[in-house]
Amino acid sequence: MTEISDLVKYAINYLSKYSSSKKNLERILKNKIRRTNIEKNEKFILYKSIPEVLKKLEKNNFINDYNYATSKVNTLISNGKSKAFIKNYLFKKEIDEKLSSNIFTEL
């Protein structure tokens, strides 16, 4: 993984298997770069390109925090989880607090 396109491919491959919030995917990409066996300056370039990759994925609707959070809230509610548990879960996944409160008011 030495190019930005490789990072995009990895992100799309990850998203084809798992749903993810923007912040969680950012963490996943940083961990992937950290584990790769490339020079430090190449890693630095890839780290700097993460916002661009995330923006591209958002633009093409591969990641959408609202859809992700809504889906997770509905799943957790159907599993009988409490509102406090769900809010804590969304907080851990770094979903914006305004967004999570909006989802709860819609339900």
Model region roles, listed by residue range:
Residues 1-107:
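An alpha-helical, amphipathic repeat domain used for nucleic-acid recognition
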